[in-house]
Amino acid sequence: MADNENELIEFPCYFPIKVIGKMSEEFSSIVITIINQHVESFDATKIEMRGSSNGKYISLTCNVFVETKEQLDKIYIDLSGHPQTQFVI
């Protein structure tokens, strides 16, 4: 439940995270590894993958069950900090 009236998200919840990076064979494995460090029950089989029209980038949409805002923030920080990641939305 949201502790603060200004919070827009109530935890725990499923939260979609979109990660965009340069197309490579290992990018999805990198994203899965990072998320697994924070979420025990992450189901990588449900990731939605979409390549860009020119084939240069790939986006992964991961529906992640998070318990707290802090947990979600740590996932974003780690994904954003990886050199192969371009954007995390």
Feature locations, PLM:
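Long, contiguous binding/interaction regions
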Residues: 1-59, 65-89
